[in-house]
Amino acid sequence: MKRHLNDVVLVFLVFIFGVKLGKGQNTTIQVINVGVVTDVGTTASNLSLLAINMSLSDFYSSRPESRTRLLLNFADSRDDVVGAAAAALDLIKNKEVKAILGPRTTMQASFVIEVGQKSQVPIISFSATSPFLDSGRSPYFFRSTYDDSSQVQAISEIIKVFGWREVVPVYENNAFGEGIMPGLTDALQAINIRIPYRTVISPNATDDEISVDLLKLMTKPTRVFVVHMNRFLASRVFSKARETGLMKQGYAWILTNGVIDHLVLMNGTDIEAMQGVIGIRTHFPISEELQTFRSRLAKAFPVSELNIYGLRAYDATTALAMAVEEAGTTNLTFSKMDGRNISDLEALSVSEYGPKLIRSLSQIQFKGLSGDYHFVDGQLHASVFEIVNVIDGGGILVGFWTQDKGLVKDLSPSSGTTRTFSSWKNHLNPILWPGITLTVPKGWEIPTNGKELQIGVPVGTFPQFVKVTTDPLTHETIVTGFCIDFFEAVIQAMPYDVSHRFIPFGDDDGKTNVFDAVVGDTTILANRSSYVDFTLPYTTSGVGMVVPLKDNVARSSLIFFKPLTPGLWGMTLGSFFVVGFVVWILEHRVNSEFTGPPQYQISTMFWFAFSIMVFAPRERVMSFTARVVVITWYFIVLVLTQSYTASLSSLLTTQQLNPTETSIKNVLAKGGPVAYQRDSFVLGKLRESGFPESRLVPFTSPEKCEELLNKGPSKGGVSAAFMEVPYVRVFLGQYCKKYKMVEVPFDVDGFGFVFPIGSPLVADVSRAILKVAESNKATQLETAWFKNIDKTCPDPMNNPDPNPTVSFRKLSLDSFLLLFVAAATVCTLALLKFVICFLIQNRIILNDEFYRGKRMKEMWLKFMESDGESYISRVRSTCPQVLIQPREEDIDPING
């Protein structure tokens, strides 16, 4: 029945074309033979043949003045590579065709192109899409369609906008299927998308073989597949995928236009198996001409709908007719080859018309049914693709991809101007995914074969982080510690379940690649990242240097001099003399207690000044000015004595703990031994810093480290210990009264969880680490494992000095300078007042000529004698019992 239908179609085409050609023939028209190589007997070929005929009919009807007419010569390739080559040879040798339209497949075209190159006959294929058929192979090959690599950018941007990090290509095992892989791989690598493995399916594979390949996919974690194959193989693959459970929720399938462009040719059962698939479809701008052509085709061939083959065949035929018209009618002959002792291919005649025709084809430009039509380097170039979602028996448009804007919901000018990636909802309309769900697949999940993640746990030095014990009853291995609890919290914070099992091991390098992950106190290092992937760090970073503390204060019999600097001692002593002298000047003329023999006055002066420091002096101060000076000095002495007492108390009672070393440079220069944690990368860091092997001492426990530090280098110990900051926190929690972290000489990224390179878990676990770190859970875990440590000593990273050294500072003159300036000012003003009053009182001596030559002597005598005219003296003379009231201790108990 199928062959009968094909024969009917061919007769119909020949009849129609013969009528058209007969009507247009006259003596001025040159008939040009062209060949058509196709697989007669398929729906796609029949549509193409009908479109070719309609194209010629429309072309010559609209251009009756044309000087040429194309005469089609059909040849059946019989869906075979050799058959296509034989058909092309026959058309060139026997029909002397000037160009060939076809063949249909990539494999056929590869051979036919060689034939066209030999005979200089242009080959125009409207369905061979493999990038392997590069027009650079032959200037006589023209691809009247888009090559498969033109859609890889659209595919990669779909993958990127959904946040998928791994994809598995599933493609046909031939030149057509493999042709897209180089371009697809490059496009995915450019955006850091990993291809962990590939699935290659033979076009001749049985259903059982297809099922086996699909079952292998189920055992892998990746759930995003890019499918590139012909529609016949794709229908079988998706039928088996539905049977094996690969079309359930959580899976994502992306189809190339090799299948999506031909959905109209597929039956309902095949399309139903593809529910939820998204794909790339060639975009054809809607036009009146396209709608008219669709209606005409439906009337002429009602058994099928218009597909890409029909449009491409129509435009390719129009382009060939225009090129022939442009090339003219000269040099239509073939140059015959000597056929003796050579093969049929070598004996091909060479078309003299070919060079002119390819030049004309390269220059052709017009607006066809499929859009703007113009060959660039022998190919058409795509600028827009449609993104479709296979739903309800067809493809629903959900967006577009354009060369300028990337993924957009529509082609309106307001849809965006730059290729920016945000939420997929800003780029595409809602999509129904496999499993009939709107939830976007995350792109991977733990394989459905029941296997648990094998989590390696390195057994370390500090049990607070990882501790491995064995249950005495069940003999079951029990793994605990801060790292383990933190990992469990991270797993709970992830959006899906991850079944896992902890397996302790003794080496944390992770090079064996036996485990699915490593969880423990494993430090993130650059050299390790070359063979594993790390998550974000979940602890503080750095390698700390821990050194002993010692009391550096030497206590002697002269320690009471240390609170004050020599400058302050000198200023204080000098101030006592100055204040005593000023008070004597102000008081000796009005206060009898400051008079008497010179020796008595001098002793009284200094006695008064120094006695202020310990008790109230017995000498009373009478003048107001002197009282101001004394009160000021009282305040200064009070401040000085209180400060001195506090400083001396601190010096006598507090240990002055200072680190024995302050930097790694000092330790390296002194040449003493240092300790490091055994089996740690710290050993390499110390070697790089210049420490010789003989000076490096390993320790296996905090107790051993403390023993080495306590002994010191002189007794077989070490001068410093180097360990990672999290370990320092634990160590100082036990011994912070004796040791201190003084420096972080090496920067590292802290502890992280380890996964194989490319593991899709890394990004999800890192995001979960951030969630836990920002929640109360992290604080609760730290409290549970380090609460006793934090009570004993602060965190060395939050407080880098868990044992702040009580560094003694002597009291200096700078601290009290303002007080001494105030005292000096008061004394100066008091003296100035006294001098002015004294000069006014004795101005007669200064002005009277009687005292000429003896004024200084008289003034001195006046200065030294008592001032009986002063207010104080007059009050004392009238009320001596009030002003001179003896103190009780001065009264003789016998004589009264």
UniProtKB/Swiss-Prot annotation:
Membrane topology summary: Multi-pass membrane protein
Signal peptide: 1-24
CDD domains for the chain: GluR_Plant, PBP1_GABAb_receptor_plant
Extracellular side of membrane: 25-565, 642-815
Single GO MF annotation: glutamate receptor activity
Pfam families on file: ANF_receptor, Lig_chan, SBP_bac_3
Entries under InterPro entries matching the protein: ANF_lig-bd_rcpt (IPR001828), GABAb_receptor_plant_PBP1 (IPR044440), Ionotropic_Glu_rcpt (IPR015683), Iontro_rcpt_C (IPR001320), Iontropic_Glu_rcpt_pln (IPR017103), Peripla_BP_I (IPR028082), Solute-binding_3/MltF_N (IPR001638)
Compartments in which it is found: Membrane
Keywords per UniProt: Glycoprotein, Ion channel, Ion transport, Ligand-gated ion channel, Membrane, Receptor, Signal, Transmembrane, Transmembrane helix, Transport
Record flagged with keyword Chloroplast: no
Any one of the GO CC terms: plasma membrane
Tissue: Expressed predominantly in roots.
Chain ranges on the Cytoplasmic side, renumbered to this chain: 587-595, 617-620, 837-896
Family: Belongs to the glutamate-gated ion channel (TC 1.A.10.1) family.
Function description: Glutamate-gated receptor that probably acts as a non-selective cation channel. May be involved in light-signal transduction and calcium homeostasis via the regulation of calcium influx into cells.
Subunit-level organization: May form heteromers.
Protein name, as recorded: Glutamate receptor 2.4
Native species: Arabidopsis thaliana
Gene name per UniProt: GLR2.4
